[in-house]
């Protein structure tokens, strides 16, 4: 005979254990033995997210919509190209979580400029042409895209882009990331080395000193001065920016530069950190390679056009929803 006295607390714990056991049985077998048990839970395990508007169901419903009919043909084309670039950044793991930014300039019917940027909260692999948010030079939203006011933009990040867009009317697209190899190069005193042919194709670089997270609009002037007329700006202790005449050019320039920083990192390791062990080509050879690759006849099209087009076809094979 059992002599142990069962208290209300022990009975409650026993019931809890039985309930958990039944739920485990359901998880393993698919047989729901808990049906009929009392529950106060209002959480739907299939749809729960920390905020309901950020749930898979809510976001997918938004991203199925298209608003491309509201824009000019030029803007639609730019939206599709920029959405493709976001998807490719995600595919290559060039982004840092949902951070970093790619922007593109579009001309309005009245001749003024607007800029496209990602909703702050979408994964790069979710971005569509219709989800891109249109802002003015100051980051004020002119068209929220299909996500409405759910996400908005990362205004701190736009400080960098707006500074360069203002200073460089020749630039259509700007891309920024913190890719580890590029960020690593930004942290060493000698900076970027033009070692292999890949680095010669990306062209000359310039630098901007670190002032913490770029949130101060007062820093915009020095950003504009530091990039000057170059297409690559290394943000010391931070990351990398490419700025170019098209989305394709900014994308392919980023591709080549990131590859070059990876080569430099491996070469430096192989050289045991001794600069004397590195073969660095002379400037004339570097300039020759750069000039050849930027000539239209080299590929038969403007820089970056064939490259972006090729990878848009890859995206079409994988998931063409970026075009929505």
Swiss-Prot record:
GO terms for cellular component: cytoskeleton. Signal peptide: none annotated. Induction: By stress. One of its GO terms (biological process) is actin cytoskeleton organization. Pfam families: Aldolase_II. One of its GO terms (molecular function) is actin filament binding. It comes from the Eukaryota. Belongs to the aldolase class II family. Adducin subfamily. This is Adducin-related protein C1289.14. It comes from Schizosaccharomyces pombe (strain 972 / ATCC 24843) (Fission yeast).
């Amino acid at each position: 005979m059992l002599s142990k006295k069962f208290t209300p607390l022990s009975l409650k714990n026993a019931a809890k254990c039985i309930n958990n056991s039944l739920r485990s049985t359901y998880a393993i077998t698919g047989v729901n033995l808990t049906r009929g048990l009392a529950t106060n839970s209002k959480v739907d395990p299939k749809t729960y997210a920390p905020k309901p508007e950020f749930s898979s169901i809510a976001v997918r419903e938004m991203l199925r919509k298209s608003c491309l009919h509201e824009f000019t043909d030029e803007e639609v084309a730019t939206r599709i190209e920029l959405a493709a670039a976001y998807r490719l950044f995600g595919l290559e793991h060039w982004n840092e979580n949902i951070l970093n930014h790619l922007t593109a300039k579009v001309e309005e019917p009245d001749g003024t400029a607007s800029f496209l940027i990602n909703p702050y909260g979408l994964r790069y692999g979710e971005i569509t042409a219709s989800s891109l948010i249109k802002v003015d030079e100051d980051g004020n939203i002119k068209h929220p895209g299909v996500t409405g006011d759910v996400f908005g933009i990362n205004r701190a990040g736009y400080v960098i882009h707006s500074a360069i867009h203002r200073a460089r009317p020749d630039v259509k697209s700007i891309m920024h990331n913190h890719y580890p190899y590029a960020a690593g190069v930004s942290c060493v005193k000698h900076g970027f080395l033009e070692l292999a042919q890949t680095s010669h194709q990306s062209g000359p670089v310039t630098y901007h000193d670190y002032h913490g997270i770029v949130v101060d609009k007062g820093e915009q002037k020095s950003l504009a001065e530091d990039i000057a007329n170059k297409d690559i700006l290394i943000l010391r202790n931070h990351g990398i920016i490419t700025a170019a005449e098209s989305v394709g050019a900014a994308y392919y320039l980023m591709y080549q530069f990131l590859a070059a920083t990876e080569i430099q990192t491996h070469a430096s390791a192989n050289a045991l950190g001794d600069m004397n062990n590195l073969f660095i080509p002379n400037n004339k050879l570097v300039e020759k390679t750069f000039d050849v690759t930027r000539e239209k006849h080299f590929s038969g099209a403007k820089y970056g056009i064939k490259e972006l087009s090729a990878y848009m076809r890859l995206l079409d094979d994988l998931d063409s929803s970026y075009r929505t």
